[in-house]
Amino acid sequence: MTAADPTASVASPSSAQPAIRVYNTLSKTKEPFLPLRAPRVGMYLCGPTVYAESHIGHMVGPVIFDTIKRYLTYSGYEVTWVVNITDVDDKLIGKSKERGIPMSQIAVEMTADYLANLRELGVNQIDHLPRATDHMPQIIAFIGSLESKGFAYAIDGDVFFDVTKDPGYGQLSNRSVEDQQGEGGGAAAKKRNPGDFALWKSARPGEPFWDSPWGEGRPGWHIECSAMSHEILGETFDIHGGGLDLMFPHHENERAQSTCCHGAPMVKYWMHNGLMRAGEKGKVGGKSDRENAAAEAASVEEQASGKISRSKGAGGLADLIRSQTGERIRFFLLRTQYRSTIVYNEETLAEAGTSLEAFYRYFDRFAEITGDSFYDLSAATRRADGGFDPAGDALLTEIHAIREKFLAAMDDDFNTGAAISVLFDALRTLNRHIDANQLAAGADAKSPAVESLVKATSVIAELSRVLGLFAKPPATSGGDEADAELLDSVVHLLINLRKEARERKDYATGDAIRDRLADLGVALLDKKEGTSWERKS
């Protein structure tokens, strides 16, 4: 079913909102960013299947879309960002059998690990983290609607989507239905067409299940995202993000389900980030237009062939954060334009660390001259508030031009690699100003040279915070204070997950969290005003 596009007649952005352009995977072009209901923006990112600890590849999408939300908010939009958690899946069931513990317990543990790692990388803009198991009524209703409209069919307790009923199937990925023929697991022989995919899977002995009109079972992977995005963002929303490897079959199937169910496009802008590749040396950072064009043309197979994954031994993210710091990893991920492949090895990560140190040295130098901390500077939090008149001041004239160049880079499909290169231009300009005016500790705070320096540096604070960088002094790797802060954060995440489990009467999971923490030397204290924790002696 191909529906009329409700996005065809939308209001132009107000004069306060800039001319941002976004690369849309569906159209294969950069398009003006015109939200459906400006200034409100709905954004959905496919999150993890929480069956094992996170690795660095899982952080690529969240860091990118956290930055995109920051920039859209800075540009005057009101963004609602959703990241789903897949907590029922074949991999989770397999891990449950392997470890001999409930699937829900594994999901709680690994969700806490994922969220703790996001926090360390400064990903704090997520508004909703829906879990599939909390949305079974919505998922079942969604499947029922597809069946009643003739887009799905049930056979022996399994429900499949009929891809032949959607003439638009394959437009997102340029794939044919024949490419989908492996989907369906052990029930694949029941399908009417090789390309049909599972919406509901009948229960097998020893596996978790939910009651449904088709009997006991559990949802397929693709339907979870369609149901949860619809529940929170509505029938059609602005941005759907995810890794390039999810374009097919996952996003293609999501799009088919939602479009057919609602008779309207699911998403206006499909955005796909490049994947992370390990073990190669190569250039990272702001790329030329030619390099970016080549990255756009790279196929899914080319990027996925070297993709970092658990199966290839990736892991140890908590240890990596401990040794490198979350800010260094975030900086490393943002140095590359988001649609490009990120080359990950010791050399490229070390290069990012060296680059970051140049900023830290400047912040120390600034503090020595002015007596002020860079991290305490007052800076504009909205684009419309950050403009200024250089009034003939040489330094401010340069910084004003640099700010415009930074904004142009971000307006051009959120090119963080180019934006970071512009910040390096600013750094060189500021250091030249200090050297030319021989500024040092004890300089007169009211001198024109120092006043210009403070104003110019506040602009750098404004722009870097848009990228989620330099909001607070750098953490030292392995420091006791950082460890204590991380421990408190993780325990409170588990306390909240335990509370939610008990509220839905999943007492086994709640007790498992308490007991596992006790094994690790953490005692939970339940009181009328809430739950706190302490180390066991």
UniProtKB/Swiss-Prot annotation:
Coiled coil: none annotated. The keyword Nucleotide-binding applies. InterPro entries: Cys-tRNA-ligase, Cys-tRNA-synt_Ia_DALR, Cys-tRNA/MSH_ligase, CysS_C, Rossmann-like_a/b/a_fold, tRNA-synt_1_cat_dom, tRNAsynth_Ia_anticodon-bd. It holds the Pfam family DALR_2. Its cofactor is Zn(2+). It catalyses: tRNA(Cys) + L-cysteine + ATP = L-cysteinyl-tRNA(Cys) + AMP + diphosphate. Its EC number is 6.1.1.16. GO terms for biological process: cysteinyl-tRNA aminoacylation. It is found in: Cytoplasm. Binds 1 zinc ion per subunit. Residues 171-194 are annotated as: Disordered. Its main location: cytoplasm. GO terms for cellular component: cytoplasm; cytosol. GO terms for molecular function: ATP binding; cysteine-tRNA ligase activity; zinc ion binding. Keywords: Aminoacyl-tRNA synthetase, ATP-binding, Cytoplasm, Ligase, Metal-binding, Nucleotide-binding, Protein biosynthesis, Zinc. It comes from the Bacteria. Belongs to the class-I aminoacyl-tRNA synthetase family. Monomer. This is Cysteine--tRNA ligase. It comes from Rhodopirellula baltica (strain DSM 10527 / NCIMB 13988 / SH1). The lineage of its organism: Bacteria, Pseudomonadati, Planctomycetota, Planctomycetia, Pirellulales.
